[in-house]
Amino acid sequence: MTTPSRRTPPPRQVAHGDPLIPPLARAIDWAPLALVTAFVAGVLSLTNAGEPLAGQDALLLMRVSGTLLGSAVAFALVDAMSADLGATAVPRWVRQSLRCLLAGGTAVAVWLGAFSYALSRLPDGTLFPVGDLLIEMAACLGIALAAAATAVRFASGRQAAMAAVVVQLGLVLATILLPEQVRLWPPTCGFGYWDQAHQFWLAMSPLPYAWLGLALRDLRR
């Protein structure tokens, strides 16, 4: 009697129209982003509750919110699916790019909601430019995503995301400690080095996303 030969299962093929986003969205670690969202909502609601929000307080809160939301999104790139999928028709860079879009888009939506609430509490006529502040948030988000995309190439689990958070917070702290002449976080909207700082942020903003694009490439085997 001949023993049936054991065949290696063929690579999983994703048929046309096979939904990838729902299982990918379920696989993302949303807990850090949910925790930061609750923190942002609580802090914005409780700061000077029942009174108008001072412009400098609102600016500080939005910067803290943008930094923490970027840190939380780093956890979305920890890909537990990679060990289970084996050979698959869906490249790693596609899965990781979708993770960036899903979690990053959610973080931006949360930040915009927080900005709208903060804006509604400011006194009439207060300068609070959404475009400039969104550039700051995009820089924090891009650095966190790029660092996380790099870290998960060398480590697995939450320790990779934590390494990315350390990199992001370290870079933010380094820019805060710069001399006043090159300060990148002016304390008052529209005054001092505000325009120059945001011209710098705008010019540098493509760099972390270019870094992210390189880090999302498929791993060489």
Task: Give residue ranges: language-model regions.
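Hydrophobic alpha-helical transmembrane segments
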Residues: 1-58, 149-154, 168-221
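Hydrophobic alpha-helical transmembrane segments of multi-pass membrane transport proteins
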Residues: 57-83
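Transmembrane alpha-helical segments that form the membrane-embedded catalytic/substrate-channel core
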Residues: 73-77, 145-150, 215
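Hydrophobic, membrane-facing alpha-helical anchors
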Residues: 9-22, 83-87, 112-122
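Membrane-interface module
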Residues: 94, 121, 128-129, 213-221
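Helix-loop-helix units of permease transmembrane domains in multi-pass membrane transporters
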Residues: 75-102
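Secretory targeting signals
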Residues: 51-55, 61-67, 98-165
